[in-house]
A protein has these predicted regions:
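Flexible "cap/lid" loop of the alpha/beta hydrolase fold
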Residues: 108, 112-113, 118-149
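Acidic catalytic loop of the alpha/beta-hydrolase fold
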Residues: 221-226
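Conserved acidic catalytic loop of the alpha/beta-hydrolase fold
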Residues: 78-95
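Catalytic active-site module of serine/aspartate enzymes centered on a nucleophile-bearing elbow/loop
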Residues: 241-275
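Conserved alpha/beta-hydrolase catalytic His-Asp/Glu region
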Residues: 132-136, 150-209
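Conserved HGGG/HGGXW glycine-rich cap/lid loop of the alpha/beta-hydrolase fold
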Residues: 19-72
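Alpha/beta-hydrolase fold catalytic core
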Residues: 1-30, 51-55, 92-93, 202, ...
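Short beta-strand/loop motif that positions the catalytic acidic residue
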Residues: 211, 217-219
Length: 275
């Protein structure tokens, strides 16, 4: 394999072993893992900016976009193994790994399973050790899913959670983009992945002290389900963890406040690279 710094790679799209991916830019490898119900296109504001400094790899997690389905009852390590296989295919030994929401669970699982392959890990809008009320709500949503796709009321409720209700006028366009992704997600893939997401908030409780690399836990001040308290708790548990809270933002801050999210990510990654 090759070192994380790669040069001479033109932007490209591909599919390997049922995983659809895109690569853009040159430099140290940086991996972007989207959340449940989305696909790699949701990272467009990050890819546009970060490809100037990094070799940015975004991909569709199992059950999403153009990637294959996960197992009927998947585990987090199945999603982590998907990323490991993709990095092998791309000849990337080590990388900075960034996840959002469900993607943060995968990023942390990957960092714990393959620490030698992770220079730094950033968990955006991550869930961790939900309160009983939070857990009951997400488990109820998971139990209501079937393989027939998201009904319009469910999509409306999700957009309201992620953007506020009503959606602020200046966010209407990006909210419609997110709504369209939810409406077209593979229904089986979404249901299988969401059930795992709903039940995995304690997957890293007691394990974060094993994170050897720099770890950033960043969320929005107004995100009720991936709360600032969760990010602070994770940062306190990780030996090299730190929390960043973005003022006035909610769950989809990578598309509602891309400039500040990108700036915080670049600052963190550069500091991690010097550590």
């Amino acid at each position: 394999m090759k070192h994380e710094t790669m040069t001479g790679h033109a932007p490209m799209n591909g599919v390997f072993d049922g995983t659809a991916y895109s690569v853009a830019g040159e430099g140290p490898a940086l991996i972007l893992i989207h959340g449940v119900g989305m696909n790699r296109s949701v990272w467009a504001p990050q890819v546009d900016a970060l490809q100037l400094c990094f070799r940015v790899v975004s991909y569709d997690m199992l059950g999403h976009g153009a990637s294959r389905l996960p197992a009927v009852s998947p585990a987090l390590d199945e999603y982590a193994a998907q990323l490991a296989a993709l990095l092998d295919h791309l000849q990337i030994d080590v990388a900075h790994v960034v996840g959002h929401s469900m993607g943060s669970l995968i990023a942390l699982e990957f960092a714990l399973h393959y620490p030698q392959r992770v220079t730094s890990v950033a968990a955006l809008n991550a869930v961790y050790d939900r309160t009983p009320t939070q857990r009951a709500a997400v488990m109820q949503r998971a139990a209501s899913l079937d393989d027939g796709g998201l009904e319009q009321p469910s999509i409306d409720a999700t957009v309201a959670r992620w953007f506020d209700d009503p959606v602020p006028g200046h966010l209407a366009q990006v909210a419609e983009l997110v709504r369209s992704l939810l409406a077209t997600v593979n229904p089986e893939g979404y249901a299988r992945t969401y059930r795992l997401f709903a039940s995995s908030d304690q997957a890293h409780v007691g394990r974060l002290p094993q994170l050897a690399m720099p770890a950033l836990f960043m969320t929005g001040e107004c995100d009720p389900n991936s709360s600032p308290a969760m990010s602070h708790s994770m940062a306190a548990a990780a030996p090299r963890g730190r929390a960043e809270i973005i003022a006035n933002e909610r769950h989809m801050m990578n598309v509602t406040a891309p400039a500040i999210v990108n700036q915080r990510l670049v600052q963190f990654i550069r500091e991690a690279s010097r550590a």
